[in-house]
Amino acid sequence: MNCAIDHLVITAPSLAAGTKMLHDALGIWPQPGGEHVRMGTHNALLRLGEKLYLEVIAIDPAMANPNRPRWFRLDELTAQSMPRLATWVARCADIHAAHAACGAMHGEIEAMSRGDLNWQISIAEDGSMPFDGIAPSLIQWQSPQHPASRLEDRGCELVSWSGLHPQAERLGDLLYALKIESRVSILSPPRANLVA
């Protein structure tokens, strides 16, 4: 069981706020993604590699409330919240084996879709993120084509990234259990933070 970084997740109070923040930082607008009907969210995407992308995600005000906590703690955001790099998602060849290696903190494995894309993803019942977002959610794509391959290459790539968490040793053990193929620096500050 090997896992690799699949995508980084920026959460925002609105898709417009999130895409503007990304444009202000990089000078590039992400491409429209689509809607996640089961979660009442929508996204925009920026390719970072052949099987790697950056996702900006927000609640879609035009969609019905899902009557459950939304993923990535989106329900906790207010209109005044700043868009931020909240977490990342690890791609697994066998999500059930990866989930078993992680334990209960990753929630349940659920089937999701967006347009013609289908996948399984780990989602905590309360919408929280493992290790405050520094540990990944888990994903296994059911579609033959990775979504990053559909995106325009705008010359962006992930150069480095670091996870900062007070329980760095425990987090490192989790990433080791997942056999994460990409290098991530894990540091131990007083507060959790993700930097890319």
Give the label of every model feature segment:
Residues P32, M39-K51:
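N-terminal low-complexity or amphipathic/hydrophobic leaders
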Residues G34-V37, P61:
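Short, acidic/turn-prone active-site loops that include or flank metal/cofactor-
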Residues V37-H42, P189-R191:
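Beta-rich nucleic-acid/ligand-interaction surfaces
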Residues M1-I5, I10-W29, L48-A196:
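Glyoxalase I/VOC metalloenzyme domain signal
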